């Protein structure tokens, strides 16, 4: 599937949270909160003016409860508005 965001939207691939502690203890998916992590990699950008400073490959922090989830096989993506991106991780 080839997904191209339109306007002020961004296609994100969420980054899964580490599923074990620093000491090596494995966590269950419920205790690790993998569904609520709000960091992602930018996969594609629309052509909106608000997207200045964001590029494909950037890691970003986005509003936790924003966007629409899309699945392509086993991979989950989010389409979010540019206003829902809070910061770029350097």
Curated annotation (Swiss-Prot):
Keywords: Chaperone, Cytoplasm. Pfam families: Cpn10. GO terms for biological process: chaperone cofactor-dependent protein refolding. Coiled coil: none annotated. CDD domains: cpn10. Signal peptide: none annotated. One of its GO terms (cellular component) is cytoplasm. It is found in: Cytoplasm. It comes from the Bacteria. Its main location: cytoplasm. One of its GO terms (molecular function) is metal ion binding. SUPFAM superfamilies: GroES-like (SSF50129). InterPro entries: Chaperonin_GroES, Chaperonin_GroES_sf, Chaprnonin_Cpn10_CS, GroES-like_sf. PROSITE patterns: CHAPERONINS_CPN10 (PS00681). Together with the chaperonin GroEL, plays an essential role in assisting protein folding. The GroEL-GroES system forms a nano-cage that allows encapsulation of the non-native substrate proteins and provides a physical environment optimized to promote and accelerate protein folding. GroES binds to the apical surface of the GroEL ring, thereby capping the opening of the GroEL channel. Belongs to the GroES chaperonin family. Heptamer of 7 subunits arranged in a ring. Interacts with the chaperonin GroEL. This is Co-chaperonin GroES.
């Amino acid at each position: 599937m080839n997904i191209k965001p339109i306007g002020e939207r961004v296609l994100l691939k969420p980054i899964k949270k580490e599923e074990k502690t620093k000491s090596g203890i494995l966590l269950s998916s419920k205790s690790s909160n993998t569904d609520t992590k709000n960091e992602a990699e930018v996969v594609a950008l629309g052509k909106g003016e608000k997207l200045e400073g964001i590029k494909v490959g950037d890691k970003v922090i986005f509003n936790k409860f924003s966007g629409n989830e899309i699945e392509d096989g086993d991979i989950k993506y989010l389409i979010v508005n540019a206003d829902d991106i809070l910061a770029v991780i350097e």
